[in-house]
């Protein structure tokens, strides 16, 4: 059995209880060493075999899974954040399907949630934004033509940009090229959300690249953009005393 487990954004205590239990029971752990907090490996039993997938190819990862399965053991494939976002899990699951090896998936707290927590922010403010776009800038890995950053930026929605801090100048240019954001649109860079070395840089789209460089941030950071970072919004209808819900009648109704 292979368990794909989300490690959370960084802080060891942000892994789910299920994820922690699976780590404690695993015969083998293959973890994304470039991003997963190594403190989580302290949950492993002494005899557990541990592999750092940052040093491995897909084929090598699968070979380890097959060997453990053949020996009757269980493997935890530990991914950063939540495995469903930029986790490259589909290709692993397809290979396991072909081999008849069972697997399941335990979600984790994504770093985009960790970034919102670091900012004490709500991505979906009434009348400001009810849409969150999660994307990345094209680099060595291409993106579909219809998903170019400038095209997505044209919506003016809340945007969370992964894996792009090393292309910050191009990110800034693409955001402005979309036409919906201006140089004054609020933005922020969150470095290593929930880690002890977490850093939050608040800026605007127009100062995004310069602020990132001034703070020495070159990797392991998310870029967030949108008016949700500003001060304007309207009160939620959910807790408005005049609003009727399934559980409560509005005043005067």
Regions found by a protein language model. Name each.
Residues 1-109, 114:
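Class I S-adenosyl-L-methionine
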Residues 2, 60, 71-75, 131, ...:
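A contiguous loop/helix-start segment that scaffolds small-molecule binding in enzyme catalytic cores
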Residues 84-155, 199-202:
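Class I SAM-dependent methyltransferase SAM-binding "motif I" and its flanking Rossmann-like core
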Residues 26-27, 95-102, 126, 208-217:
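Structural recognition of alpha->loop->beta junctions
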Residues 43-44, 63-64, 116-120, 136-137, ...:
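Short secondary-structure transition/capping segments
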Residues 20, 42, 67, 124-125, ...:
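Short secondary-structure boundary/capping segments
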Residues 13-18, 37-38, 62-63, 120-121, ...:
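A generic local structural motif
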């Amino acid at each position: 059995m292979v368990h794909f487990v989300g490690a959370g954004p960084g802080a060891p205590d942000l892994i789910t209880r299920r994820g922690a239990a699976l780590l404690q029971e695993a015969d083998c752990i293959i973890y994304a060493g470039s991003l997963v907090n190594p403190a989580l490996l302290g949950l492993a039993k002494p005899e557990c075999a541990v592999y750092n997938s940052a040093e491995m190819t897909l084929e090598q990862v699968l070979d380890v899974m097959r060997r453990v399965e053949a020996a009757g053991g269980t493997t935890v494939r530990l991914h950063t954040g939540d495995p469903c976002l930029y986790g490259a899990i589909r290709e692993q699951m397809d290979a396991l399907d072909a081999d008849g090896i069972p697997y399941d998936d335990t979600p984790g707290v994504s770093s985009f949630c960790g970034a919102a927590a670091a900012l004490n922010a709500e991505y979906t403010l009434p009348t400001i934004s009810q849409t969150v776009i999660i994307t990345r800038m094209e680099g060595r890995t291409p993106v579909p033509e219809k998903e170019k950053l400038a095209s997505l930026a044209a919506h003016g929605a809340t945007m969370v940009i992964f894996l792009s801090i090393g292309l910050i100048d191009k990110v800034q240019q693409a955001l402005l090229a979309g036409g919906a954001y201006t140089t004054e649109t609020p933005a922020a860079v969150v470095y290593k959300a929930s880690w002890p070395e977490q850093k939050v840089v608040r800026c605007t789209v127009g100062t995004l690249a310069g602020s990132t460089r001034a703070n020495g941030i070159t990797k392991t950071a998310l870029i967030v953009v949108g008016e949700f970072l500003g001060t304007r919004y309207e009160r939620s209808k959910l807790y408005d005393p005049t609003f009727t819900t399934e559980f409560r009648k509005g005043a005067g109704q």
